């Protein structure tokens, strides 16, 4: 039986350090029929733990009327996580935040007049009743690894000091008395929040859409290597951040709210990239973090309320307005399950953590000092994010082994380029020097030194970042420099395989196939009986590759299922060592031609043709078969512009297995989609093409698109500006249909 514990450095499994990856996914913000596939996606992207809130208002919107059915069915969600061997970190509140109405408190609770978030007996009685309902959902499941009590308590509301500590202890005791059990019990620790004897988890975001500023924010400190774990800017719309209420050195550095993206607000709309999240994550790794936990990892859509909408808004006392429905969060997996470039970026770190986490967890950060030859060398803890010329570097090591981290990325700002940098590390056996290289703006990476390949072979250095290994024989690295290394002995049965960063992001590791590394620009998921590729008509790819350990894996099984052995190793791989120990196979994918497109202006009526042949959509001229019409509705006297979208589908279309995404390229304040008079989707403009799953809504044949005008002088911070005409914009630039299907491998 697995035994989980904790020490002052890391989480432990059977007395060995572990470095898990955790991603937030709110089950009640996703339709129940989609849960299993979305769990499989998170597993494929390298997540080990799914964190989720249990929003009180989602389950008891009306006092005494509990709802744990449909997309609120917590028990079924937990059983699916269990099925796919995913742990769960349950955030039971009672207060949550999560951009939910009242922070997750039902309206009726606020009207009671009780002293909420305190030891008020009347309040605690209602908490106990709610938690007992949650516990009934938890009973019979075996996947809960951690439980978080409250959220941002003593920082965003709640009591401070001794009274706050006492309340957190009261809640923890209540939960355990009810019957909740978990190896780990946590509380958010940033901003001066109190713990009540719980383990603190930290956070950090690349931007602050809750900030009142309507300008670009100063350089973010989350892009520094630093001993500072506290991001006091989180929740600064409620209260200014304060110093930590605990001794950070007494606890491992664990995160639960590294922003996988950010949720845009009406007044502030950052546009997040994969590199924004990747560079921030590398800085946390270098600074000593031993659990990367992302909020959000999977976006969602707010459920429909019985009495009101369920989003945070200024109308109910919040400081920000967010979309009524969309909780996309620009997350690694988007609100309709689209796997983004951010997910692929973070997958680089999950593969590293899974294969090297045990030793990495016991390595401590040591700041650069004299370990670098550069135009500017830092000699201590990094504090000034506004210094864009400083060379940011740190080593994380145990004795003479470790990793050298470099970050020359600062979201929204240009860092100075550093020419001919020789990275150096001091060890007991002398200085380790890496080949000179230019560190350009936007670069971030980490290199190993004294990297153990076997009992006999150590890489003294290599100018590549470790990705993963297979059976400690095939060692995969990536980087944009040509691979160079120094080993203390000749490679014996060891193979070093390097690739550039793009191909590394195409790597997929399946728990079902531990001796194989898959390569595909398209997502690869495990199924109950094998694997499948998620193909899209706008992301063409000719083939997939696998690399396996030829000494333990039988290639014949794969060849019998359509995989082919190429004559030479593909040119995206650079191999050092005995290549006979590796087997490379490729598989041709069904070609995906151009997606269906409809381009139109405000006054034109255009047809969007959807035609299907051999499971693929093609662009087609206007004919008598399947079409989607888009036409403008008279907007005279209205403060919005509307369009009717009429769609018909090919009869051969397999709705059970395939999907169509409606891509809407608009420039306006916000867009809304209506089906049969009911709003089903919405989005604030940030500069991205908006994607909506038509399968989610049972492939509707008619939709209404509504756009609201954006004025150039509106009090809104836009990172990406639209095209204004006479100080105004409210236009539909383009609309397309993208076909998605799965191919079994």
Predicted regions, residues:
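Aromatic-lined substrate-binding rim segments of carbohydrate-active enzymes
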Residues: 35-102, 176
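The substrate-binding groove and active-site-proximal loops of carbohydrate-active enzymes
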Residues: 20-32, 55-74, 110-129, 150-165, ...
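Substrate-binding cleft/loops of secretory-pathway carbohydrate-active enzymes
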Residues: 152-183, 188-230, 236, 301-307, ...
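Carbohydrate-binding surfaces of carbohydrate-active enzymes
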Residues: 112, 124-136, 143-145, 154, ...
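Aromatic-lined ligand-binding clefts that engage carbohydrates, nucleic acids, or primary amines
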Residues: 653-675, 705-706
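Aromatic- and acidic-residue-enriched segments that line the glycan-binding/catalytic groove
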Residues: 64-72, 94-121, 125, 129-135, ...
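Glycoside hydrolase catalytic-domain groove-lining segments
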Residues: 196-266, 280, 320-322, 326, ...
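N-terminal carbohydrate-binding accessory modules
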Residues: 1-49, 79, 741
């Amino acid at each position: 039986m697995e035994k989980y514990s904790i020490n002052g450095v890391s989480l432990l499994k059977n007395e060995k350090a572990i470095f898990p990856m955790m991603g937030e996914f709110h089950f009640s913000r996703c339709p129940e029929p989609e849960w299993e596939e979305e769990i499989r996606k998170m597993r494929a992207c390298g997540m080990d733990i799914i964190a989720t809130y249990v929003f009180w208002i989602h389950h008891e919107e009306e006092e005494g009327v509990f709802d744990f059915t449909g997309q609120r069915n917590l028990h079924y969600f937990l059983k699916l996580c269990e099925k796919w061997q995913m742990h769960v970190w349950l955030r039971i509140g009672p207060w949550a935040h999560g951009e939910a109405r009242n922070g997750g408190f039902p309206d009726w609770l606020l009207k009671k007049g009780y002293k909420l978030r305190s030891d008020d007996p009347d309040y605690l009685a209602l908490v106990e009743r709610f938690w007992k309902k949650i516990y009934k959902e938890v009973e019979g499941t075996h996947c809960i690894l951690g439980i978080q009590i409250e959220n941002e308590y003593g920082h965003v509301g709640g009591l401070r000091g001794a009274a706050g500590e006492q309340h957190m202890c009261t809640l923890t005791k209540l939960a355990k008395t009810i019957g909740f059990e978990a190896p780990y019990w946590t509380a958010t620790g940033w901003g001066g929040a109190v713990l009540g004897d719980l383990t603190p988890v930290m956070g950090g975001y690349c931007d602050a859409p809750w900030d009142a500023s309507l300008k670009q924010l100063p350089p973010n400190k989350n892009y520094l290597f630093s001993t500072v774990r506290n991001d006091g800017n989180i929740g600064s719309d409620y209260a200014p951040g304060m110093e930590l209420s605990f001794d950070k050195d007494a606890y491992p550095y664990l995160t639960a709210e590294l922003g996988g993206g950010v949720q845009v607000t009406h007044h502030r709309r950052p546009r997040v990239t994969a590199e924004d999240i990747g560079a921030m994550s590398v800085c946390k790794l270098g600074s000593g973090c031993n659990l990367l936990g992302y909020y959000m990892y999977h976006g969602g859509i707010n459920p429909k309320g019985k009495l009101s909408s369920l989003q945070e808004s200024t109308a109910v006392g919040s400081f920000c307005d967010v979309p009524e429905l969309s909780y996309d969060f620009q997350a690694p997996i988007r609100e309709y399950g689209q796997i983004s470039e951010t997910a692929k970026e973070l997958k680089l770190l999950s593969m590293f953590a899974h294969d090297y986490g045990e030793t990495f967890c016991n390595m401590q950060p040591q700041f650069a000092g004299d370990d670098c030859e550069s135009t500017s060398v830092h000699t201590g803890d990094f504090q000034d994010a506004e210094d864009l010329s400083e060379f940011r570097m740190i080593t994380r090591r145990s004795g003479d082994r470790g990793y050298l981290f470099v970050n020359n990325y600062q979201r929204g700002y240009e860092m100075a380029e550093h020419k001919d940098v020789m990275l150096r590390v001091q060890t007991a056996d002398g200085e380790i020097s890496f080949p000179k290289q230019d560190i350009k703006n936007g670069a971030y990476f980490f290199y190993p030194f004294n990297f153990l390949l076997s009992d006999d072979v150590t890489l003294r250095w290599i100018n590549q970042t470790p990705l993963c290994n297979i059976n400690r024989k095939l060692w995969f690295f990536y980087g944009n420099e040509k691979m160079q290394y120094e080993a203390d002995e000749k490679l014996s049965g060891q193979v070093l395989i390097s690739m550039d960063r793009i191909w590394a992001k195409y790597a997929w590791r399946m728990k079902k196939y531990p001796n194989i590394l898959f390569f595909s620009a398209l997502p690869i998921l495990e199924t109950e009986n094998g694997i499948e590729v998620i193909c899209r008509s706008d992301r063409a790819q000719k083939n997939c590759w696998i690399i396996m350990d030829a000494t333990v894996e039988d290639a014949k099984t794969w060849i019998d299922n359509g995989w082919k052995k190429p004559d030479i190793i593909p040119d995206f791989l650079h191999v050092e060592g005995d290549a006979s120990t590796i087997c490379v196979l490729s598989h041709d994918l069904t070609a995906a031609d151009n997606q269906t497109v409809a381009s139109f202006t405000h006054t034109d009526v255009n047809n969007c043709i959807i035609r299907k042949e051999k499971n693929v959509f093609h662009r087609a001229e206007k004919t008598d078969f399947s079409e989607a019409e888009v036409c403008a509705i008279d907007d005279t006297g209205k403060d919005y512009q509307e369009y009717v979208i009429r769609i018909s589908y090919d009869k051969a279309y397999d709705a059970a297995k395939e999907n169509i995404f409606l891509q809407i390229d608009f420039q306006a304040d916000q867009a809304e989609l209506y089906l049969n008079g009911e709003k089903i989707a919405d989005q604030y403009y940030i500069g991205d093409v908006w994607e909506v799953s038509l399968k989610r809504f049972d492939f509707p044949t008619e939709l209404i698109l509504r756009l609201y005008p954006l004025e150039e002088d509106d009090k809104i911070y836009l990172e990406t500006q639209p095209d204004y005409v006479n100080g105004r914009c409210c236009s539909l630039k383009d609309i397309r249909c993208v076909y998605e299907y799965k191919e079994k491998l």
